[in-house]
């Protein structure tokens, strides 16, 4: 799924608003601080496109709200910023390591046929790749449902593609201006 031009336009508007909010504080800062401000405003703009309807957008809003609460409140002013910032994400459930180790030992003791071994390898591979997705998508580590994780990942990819398209068009426009 490709991002629509209206998504690109809305992202650009929200990103510009975030950069304008940061503008007074950016002028006398280091390159690292400017980079951080650009990334922070882009993340908030991307999350505000989804208006907190997805887990990854709420996770980004929560993360950026701790870094720069003023920016988040300004950029989310039209979509109930207080409820999104204060909305708690579900807590991750944690297993006891001893129990997990004990159950793994019991499983190893049982003999497996070749097909069972292949199925177990495939399960481990899927689990490893799913964990990789959980680490990439904001808030992914809190999602226990794999189908929801895939839906959120696809939505996050579309939003990242929107961000890349807008940034690429800005760079192209700047390069065209320099060539003149």
From Swiss-Prot:
Keyword annotations from UniProtKB, A to Z: Brassinosteroid signaling pathway, DNA-binding, Gibberellin signaling pathway, Growth regulation, Nucleus, Transcription, Transcription regulation
BP GO annotations: brassinosteroid mediated signaling pathway; gibberellic acid mediated signaling pathway; regulation of growth
PANTHER family named among the record's database cross-references: TRANSCRIPTION FACTOR IBH1-LIKE 1
Observed phenotype of the null mutant: No visible phenotype.
Family, similarity comment: Belongs to the bHLH protein family.
Cross-referenced InterPro entries: bHLH_AtIBH1-like (IPR044549), HLH_DNA-bd_sf (IPR036638), IBH1-like (IPR044660)
Further remarks about this protein from its record: Plants over-expressing IBL1 are dwarf with round-shaped, dark-green leaves and short petioles.
Sample GO molecular function, one term: protein dimerization activity
Transcription recorded as keyword: yes
Positions of the bHLH domain: 110-160
Annotated function: Functions redundandly with IBH1/BHLH158 in a regulation node known as the incoherent feed-forward loop (FFL). Acts as transcriptional repressor that negatively regulates cell and organ elongation in response to gibberellin (GA) and brassinosteroid (BR) signaling.
GO cellular component, one term: nucleus
The protein, known as: Transcription factor IBH1-like 1
């Amino acid at each position: 799924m490709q991002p629509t031009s209206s998504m690109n336009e809305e992202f650009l508007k929200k990103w510009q608003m975030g950069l304008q909010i940061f503008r007074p504080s950016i002028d006398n800062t280091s390159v690292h601080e400017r980079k951080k401000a650009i990334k922070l405003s882009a993340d908030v703009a991307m999350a505000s496109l989804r208006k907190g309807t997805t887990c990854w957008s709420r996770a980004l809003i929560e993360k950026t709200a701790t870094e720069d609460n003023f920016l988040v409140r300004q950029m989310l002013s039209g979509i109930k910023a207080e409820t999104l910032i204060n909305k708690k994400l579900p807590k991750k459930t944690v297993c006891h390591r001893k129990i997990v180790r004990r159950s793994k030992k019991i499983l190893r003791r049982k003999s497996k046929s070749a097909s069972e071994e292949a199925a177990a390898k495939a399960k481990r591979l899927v689990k490893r790749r799913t964990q990789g997705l959980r680490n990439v998508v904001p808030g992914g580590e809190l999602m226990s449902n794999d189908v929801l994780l895939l839906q959120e990942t696809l939505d996050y990819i579309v939003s990242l593609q929107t961000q890349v398209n807008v940034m690429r068009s800005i760079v192209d426009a700047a390069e065209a201006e320099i060539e003149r």
